[in-house]
Amino acid sequence: IKMFNDAHARSLHVIGNHDTDNGHTKEQCLDIWGMPGRYYTQDIEGLQLVVLDGNDRGSPTHEGGYVSYFGKEQTKWLKEQLANLDGPIIIVSHQPLAGYAAVDNAEEMQGILGDAADKVILAINGHSHIDEVLRIKGVTYMHVNSASYQWVGGKYRHESYSKEVHAKYPWISHTCPYRDSLFATFTFDPKSLAVGVEGRQSEWVGKAPAELGVDLDPSLTNGGEISPQIRDRTFLRIAK
């Protein structure tokens, strides 16, 4: 974390579902990462980032596994921020607010952001390991792909590397790895409010999910959203 923070003029962090694995607490994450809170706002030369924590408990539809929810305290805070901030605003969360693998109260969150669509220029998330863009109630949502793999689970266990590698890192057999790391650079034009995305292209190591018979979700296509890439994009604001 120190190396990451030291490598950037300003480093911001968002809590994901795996960050509290192995008994780690959110308080430890906040302390070690230097976060001001588990959800917070940050102004960067007029661009206002609203960073959220999608790991609240209390979802009435939670059926086990990792929580994926925004509780009443946080949604109340979000509404207040959206009302008080002038914009432009980018929403940042680990769990998706729309589309595949969205939080349990996705419709509620989409309604909250939709009410502030004149200020919210983009909402970005990780978690889903796909490359997808949606537009709902005037707000654009982008799933930023995983850095390194697509999870396929134990049913589709297979070897993409040498037996020595799989013996040392057994969980790799539950994934379809990317040959190169993926990341994206976002740029913002304060005059036009356009957001540019410079992504990365890679390829599968070993078999692709489609070759294994993986059908991740009816809404997703292999070679489309399910692919080892983050596409270059430009998001333009609709003139009013």
What are these regions (language model features)?
Residues 1-79, 83-84, 108-121, 130-188:
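Extended active-site neighborhood of metal-dependent phosphoesterases/phosphodiesterases
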Residues 16-17, 94, 126-127:
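Active-site glycine-centered loops adjacent to acidic/histidine catalytic or metal-binding residues
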Residues 19-23, 98-103:
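Acidic-and-aromatic substrate-binding clefts and catalytic sites of carbohydrate-active enzymes
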Residues 49-51, 90-92, 124:
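Structural motif
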Residues 60-62, 101, 151, 196, ...:
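Short acidic, gly/pro-rich beta-turn/loop elements at beta-sheet edges
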Residues 80-100:
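Short acidic, glycine-rich surface-loop motifs adjacent to enzyme active sites
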Residues 103, 127-128:
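Alpha-helix N-cap/helix-start capping motif
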Residues 165-240:
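A short C-terminal boundary segment appended to hydrolase-like catalytic domains
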